[in-house]
């Protein structure tokens, strides 16, 4: 089964390195897998200020974060392939990659996969859910040719 993906990538900031549209599409397609035949998704790349504002508004945390996921929930009688939105803070991803001694590409891939899994309903609040989500993330990231994102360097 192949995924018919409509991906809108919004660049609201600049940085030294960003994934290509093709990389974003590969990572989203990998994360979504066989969960759906058709999907629409927006990835918005933002600066620290916008990330902090959104994180404060929607999560009550007054600091920028790496990725925020906003799933779209249509009324039950309406079928739309709209999965939702990911908001990724380029500066946080760059800082985390450096701190964790990962390549930017590997960490961006991880953030996209992580965010997509949230859009699909996965979470990591409870320990059991976290184990399931991290296991799936690791499997998907390794399938993309990167190392386990949770393995200590």
Swiss-Prot record:
Role of this protein: Single strand-specific metallo-endoribonuclease involved in late-stage 70S ribosome quality control and in maturation of the 3' terminus of the 16S rRNA.
Name by which UniProt lists this protein: Endoribonuclease YbeY
Main location: cytoplasm
GO biological process, one term: rRNA processing
UniProt-listed InterPro entries: MetalPrtase_cat_dom_sf_prd (IPR023091), YbeY (IPR002036), YbeY_CS (IPR020549)
Co-factor: note: Binds 1 zinc ion.
Family: Belongs to the endoribonuclease YbeY family.
Binding site for Zn(2+): 114, 118, 124
Class of the enzyme per the UniProt entry, highest EC level: hydrolase
EC number annotated for this UniProt entry: 3.1.-.-
A GO MF term: zinc ion binding
Source taxon at top rank: Bacteria
Location of this chain's protein in the cell: Cytoplasm
Cofactor(s) needed for function: Zn(2+)
Gene Ontology CC: one annotated term: cytoplasm
Keywords assigned: Cytoplasm, Endonuclease, Hydrolase, Metal-binding, Nuclease, Ribosome biogenesis, rRNA processing, Zinc
């Amino acid at each position: 089964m192949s995924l018919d993906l409509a991906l809108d990538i919004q660049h609201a900031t600049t940085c030294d390195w960003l994934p290509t549209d093709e990389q974003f599409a590969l990572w989203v397609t990998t994360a979504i897998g066989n969960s759906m035949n058709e999907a629409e998704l927006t990835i918005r790349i933002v600066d620290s200020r916008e990330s902090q504002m959104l994180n404060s508004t929607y999560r009550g945390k007054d600091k920028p974060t790496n990725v925020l996921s906003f799933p779209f929930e249509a009324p039950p009688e309406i079928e739309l392939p709209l999965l939702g939105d990911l908001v990724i803070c380029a500066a946080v991803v760059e800082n985390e990659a450096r701190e964790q001694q990962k390549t930017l590409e590997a960490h961006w891939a991880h953030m996209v996969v992580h965010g997509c899994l949230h859009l699909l309903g996965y979470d990591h609040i409870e320990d059991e859910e976290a184990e399931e989500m991290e296991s799936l993330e690791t499997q998907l990231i390794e399938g993309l040719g990167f190392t386990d994102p949770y393995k200590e360097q």
